Structures are given as C-alpha cells and as structure tokens.
C-alpha cells in the first residue's frame, strides 16, 4: 500500500453457520481505532454466537505495525479499505469499526460502495473527542476553543507540555500521536 504494506488477518467463516445464514454478508471487515493492532480486534469475533462470514482485520495507515514502519494516519480511509478488499478479492462486505475505527468505518462506507452494512461501535465523532471527553465537563469548551483557534502557537505548545502531567491517559495519547 503506497510505499509500504498493510498487515491483514483473514479468519474464514464457519461453514455450518454460513449454510444456516445464507443472507448474511460473506465478509466482515473489522477496523481498529487510533492505537489498535489487527490482532487485538480479532478477539471481538470470538464473542459472536455464530459466524457465517469471513472476518478480515487490518492495520491501516497510522495503526499497529504501519506506525512502526513510519506510515502516517490518513483521513481518506476508503483507500486502505479498498486496497484490503481488492487484495482478498471481496466484492461486497459488511464493515465494523471500533472506537475511532467507528469514525473511520463511516468514512470508508461513504466512499466505498462495496461496503453493504456498517457497524460503528463505541465511536467518536471527531479525533479531538479522545482528548476532551476525559476532561471535566467544565474544561471541555475551553479545550475546544483552544484547538479551534490554534493561535498563539506557544499557548498550545505550553498546554500540551503541562496537561499530560495531570492526566496519564492524555499523556499516553499524545505520546502515541507523536508517532503519526
């Protein structure tokens, strides 16, 4: 993909379930969020009571192994999704996104007509929510205002140096984002 490669895992359907549910999509493409690995999300599939579809998970740009390879996150999520579907020869699939993957899956579905069904699980409407939702409710509008008007830059830089000292989750997210 581009100058690199995407990691993908394919788990084939249970043939007995496929014959019992012939109307089910043949494939479910599962997508992680901001910091996931393809190997992590496959664990969700263990909880399906039946599995009449193949499951494909992948690390898109800016996720999992692609981060380690220096591939940055890209907003046009339909492109890596279509590349994975092309690689596996998938004509039509349902798609599920978890966390920020819920946002990404909707983007992919909006521009990839081969996605027939969408499940946005535990999603965020914008990446900034991952930083502001853990804040006390009274501070969220202030954070939104600062990010919405990133001037002066020194103020943003100072806030990003100080805030992580008081919030381990924010500290980790900013550290993770520095790789993207």
Identify the function of each model-found stretch:
Residues 1-23:
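N-terminal cap/lid segment of alpha/beta-hydrolase-fold proteins
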Residues 22-33:
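Short beta-strand element of the alpha/beta-hydrolase
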Residues 31, 58-60, 121:
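Alpha/beta-hydrolase
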Residues 34-46:
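The serine-hydrolase catalytic nucleophile loop
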Residues 40, 70-94, 100-107:
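Alpha/beta-hydrolase active-site loop
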Residues 48-65:
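Conserved alpha/beta-hydrolase
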Residues 59, 93-94, 117-119:
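Residue in the alpha/beta-hydrolase core beta-strand immediately N-terminal to the catalytic nucleophile
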Residues 110-180:
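Hydrolase active-site cap/lid region
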